[in-house]
Amino acid sequence: MNRTAFCCLSLTTALILTACSSGGGGVAADIGAGLADALTAPLDHKDKGLQSLTLDQSVRKNEKLKLAAQGAEKTYGNGDSLNTGKLKNDKVSRFDFIRQIEVDGQLITLESGEFQVYKQSHSALTAFQTEQIQDSEHSGKMVAKRQFRIGDIAGEHTSFDKLPEGGRATYRGTAFGSDDAGGKLTYTIDFAAKQGNGKIEHLKSPELNVDLAAADIKPDGKRHAVISGSVLYNQAEKGSYSLGIFGGKAQEVAGSAEVKTVNGIRHIGLAAKQ
């Protein structure tokens, strides 16, 4: 089988696998026409919420990310924009994906599965629920391997220099991981102290329901307000978390957590608003 045919077969496999695996775990998913529109429609400034998301970490240089939904397809490269204005706020939007790399003029499939987007009014994050990867060390064929990771976290960043000077704000939203988007995030920021802390609850695995230890708000290299701290389970450090603050008035947070468990490191997407 030539590589071109192999890539087409991989997309078909991704569609079948994702159709079988989607919708579990009580996930609030976007299944409306907006999925196809996100791939085909031009940007419309009348759309509500964050209108576009630059795919930076989701697609590396020299790679291609092919997304499909409801009969529509589109291929993205590093730095391309996804039309998130067509997606529903505060829900997981699900696309089938294949990730490919070009070698000697040929596209080779690296992995396939489900590409997820969680959008708020001022921020969004992407995640990959991989179902198959290329067995590069042995057969070179696609083999089943389920894994979950976070891609991009982006939006309308809050400048560190424009944070509220005082007061406290509590953010409530979602925490989601592999086959489980039923988690809840609660995070409180003390703007006077420039510090935040919170917790993740209601995920299926008890060891993923963790405390997000108090951590300072700091400026990153672009002067965006960000928070990085430790994850605690039964008061023991079990990983780390990072959050960006988004919106002109610090209305939202979005980020991720990495939790060490008996089955390895688990990745969790985080998003919440005041």
From Swiss-Prot:
Region annotated Domain A sits at: 27-119
Question: Which PROSITE patterns would you find in this protein's record?
Answer: PROKAR_LIPOPROTEIN
What, per the annotation, is the impact of changing K249R?
Increased vaccine efficacy (G1 variant)
Region (Domain C) spans which residues? 184-274
Specify the effect of E237A: 7-fold decreased binding to fH. No longer binds fH
- Lipid moiety-binding region (S-diacylglycerol cysteine): C20
Subunit composition?
A: Binds to host factor H (fH from human). Both fHbp beta-barrels contact Sushi domains 6 and 7 in fH (also called complement control protein domains, CCP). This interaction probably mimics the normal (carbohydrate-dependent) mode of fH recruitement, regulating fH activity. Sucrose octasulphate inhibits the fHbp-fH interaction.
Q: Anything further noted?
A: One of the major antigens of group B N.meningitidis and a powerful protective antigen. It is highly variable, over 300 protein variants have been seen (see Factor H binding protein sequence typing website). The protein in strain MC58 is called V1.
Domain commentary: Divided into 3 domains by antibody recognition; domain A (27-119), domain B (120-183) and domain C (184-274). Domain A contains linear epitopes that are common to the three GNA 1870 (fHbp) variants, antibodies against it recognize N.meningitidis cells. Domain B contains linear epitopes common to variant 1 proteins but antibodies against it do not give a robust signal against N.meningitidis cells. Domain C does not have linear epitopes but antibodies against it recognize N.meningitidis cells. Bactericidal antibodies are directed against conformational epitopes located in the BC domain.
Q: Which family does it belong to?
A: Belongs to the factor H binding-protein family.
The name this protein carries in UniProt is Factor H binding protein
